[in-house]
Amino acid sequence: MTISKAHALIALAAAAALPLAACADPTSTNSSTSSSTSGTDTSTAAATTTSYDVSKIPTVDDIAALVPDEVKQRGTLRNGASADYAPAEFLGDDSQTAQGYDVDINKALAKVMGLNDGTTNHAEFPTIIPALGTKFDVGISSFTITSEREEQANLISYVQVGSAYGVAAGNPKNFDPTDPCGKTIGVQTGTAQEDYANELSEQCVADGKDKITIMPHDLQTDITTKVIGGQYDATFADSTVIGYTTNLSGGKLEQVGDIVESAPQGVAINKNDEQLTQAVQKAMQYLMDNGYLKDILATYGAQDAALTTAELNPATND
């Protein structure tokens, strides 16, 4: 995102209305539980949260043949995700099991690739890409595709998601999404929204207004708590996250303003692993072509985010 786009955001000239995804309340996932699961497999314990049944998805032999031997022998596709970002990735009702459409997508990719399972381990968001190729095979964790990230990893597009503001019910702090200057806004560390907020703040100062006080956190759930509690004016996050949270937050949080800055998100893979990249790209395209990706997203009310082409390192506008 450029400064000119930041200025347009403040004026809402760049606003684009998109459908809002909504499912269950992610505020039941507390930050201490999310943190404590780091480095442990959270995808096998029982939970009552809805998930997509991937058992009907077949193995595609031509794609399975592309999977690197190390991954084949292990039999699992290891995903790293920040499990506090519903509906994409979050902990289920048992506070241990990773749930969400990204978790199910990883399992679906594993099925197509002829593997036994796709497992998801919680990791704090900024640590995922550096761990690709060692701790994790893939990072499916709402990674907005940017030129900077494409320098760090291969990214395969699969959904298109915008950004939105969330405020405490009734907007008691009178937050104006068209003029966030001088406000305190919570963002998740390392996200596209953190970058956007910083550029918005720079534009505020350039326009002679007060800067935005940007409060980054590793866990989106911590931010939501502070917004509801009145410590922050707003949170700025993926539109699917805001929609999911506000719709079933018990009336404690609401979206304000339009959805802006729609951008593709991608599966991250180690930049040097061309073989796995090719296998995952073809597996994702298979899920798209056969309706599985859209069905998975529909389980979480996010079917409108589905893309139809699994593009490797697509051009970015930032």
Regions found by a protein language model. Give the residues of each.
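Acidic, polar ligand-binding/catalytic clefts
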Residues: 118-179
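Bilobed "Venus flytrap"/periplasmic-binding protein-like clamshell domains
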Residues: 98-111, 143-146, 162-219, 234, ...
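Periplasmic-binding protein-like
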Residues: 159-167, 247-284, 303-318
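Extracytoplasmic small-molecule ligand-binding "clamshell" domains
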Residues: 45-139
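A ligand-binding cleft/hinge motif common to bilobed small-molecule-binding domains
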Residues: 143-150, 198-199, 228-262
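Bacterial lipoprotein signal-peptidase II cleavage site
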Residues: 20-40
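Ligand-binding clefts/hinges and TM-proximal coupling segments of bilobed small-molecule sensing domains
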Residues: 50-67, 195-214, 285-318
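Extended ligand-binding regions for polar small-molecule ligands
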Residues: 24, 41-61, 111, 184, ...
